[in-house]
Amino acid sequence: SLIQFETLIMKVVKKSGMFWYSAYGCYCGWGGHGRPQDATDRCCFVHDCCYGKVTGCDPKMDSYTYSEENGDIVCGGDDPCKREICECDRVAAVCFRDNLDTYNSDTYWRYPTKNCQEEPDPC
């Protein structure tokens, strides 16, 4: 669920997903189109693609099971669809953490959608 995604971001990145990633670039936040603008925006693009491939459950609403082992998030549970949602969220949170050094709020926070018109790469 989106609430769990926020929790994973807090655990992995030590930042609020709501405040750092809800309106960044062309893909972080609701919707998304155009070409990702930087590495962080690409994390969101890949996350959107990942959610788009999930079938049989609702990535934004359905809860999943995970644990923490040696500081890493480990997705679990018996439902393969929910485990897939967890993996989408886990990979995105790690991607955010790994790209904090290039996060550029001055340029990409509340980035105008008119700048997101280029043809995107395929998922």
Curated annotation (Swiss-Prot):
The catalytic site is made up of 47, 89
User: Which residues does the record give as Ca(2+) binding sites?
Assistant: 27, 29, 31, 48
Cofactor(s) listed in the protein's UniProt record = Ca(2+)
Q: Where in the cell is it found?
A: Secreted
* Protein keywords: Calcium, Disulfide bond, Hemostasis impairing toxin, Hydrolase, Lipid degradation, Lipid metabolism, Metal-binding, Platelet aggregation inhibiting toxin, Secreted, Toxin
Cofactor binding, note field: Binds 1 Ca(2+) ion per subunit.
Q: Which family does it belong to?
A: Belongs to the phospholipase A2 family. Group II subfamily. D49 sub-subfamily.
Q: What is this protein called?
A: Acidic phospholipase A2
The organism that produces this protein has a lineage beginning with:
Eukaryota, Metazoa, Chordata, Craniata, Vertebrata
